[in-house]
Amino acid sequence: MKLRCTKSYFNLPVAHMQWFDTNETGEPCTGPCAKWHGYDRSVHFEFAGEPDEHGWIVGFGDLKPVKEFLEFYFDHTALIAADDPRIEKAIQAHEDELVDLRILPYGVSMEMSSIFIWEQVNPFIYSVTDGRSYISRVECREHEKNSAFIEIEEKVALKQGKLTKRYLQQYTTWRRFVKPGDILKKYAK
């Protein structure tokens, strides 16, 4: 029997910028979303799997590392995409302690954030549930009006969950910062 449960995390104030946003000239980095702006994000997980001997899909007490991971990336931080042409300036702002920068490999949109979070957290869930459970959906909300989500088929989620490494693109600038999998790895069985 496949059961599902959910867990939500709120109050993740984060700034981001999307370099590809344009103004009426059509030039990248000129639109309003190309500048730092922020939202109070929330992340909502749906877990699926077989219940354990207590009847739980996921023990919510086991999710403290997930909260730590989300707070590291999305709590009072500034996000930038790894392919943003202004990345060196953002890194300089981080080094000057003007922002607490986090570099996301695919982009900072809700869609790309959903993928990033799923890739990092699903192997952890697989590990702490001894392979019984997986993340079937991750929804990222930037506020009450806008959200995006990723839904994953069971066989894909379980196959990815078995992997011990994360498939993140390794940009030169990325290496100066904590790799996301390192945060959760210390908690995995």
State the predicted function of each range:
Residues M1-K189:
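Charge-rich, low-complexity N-terminal segments
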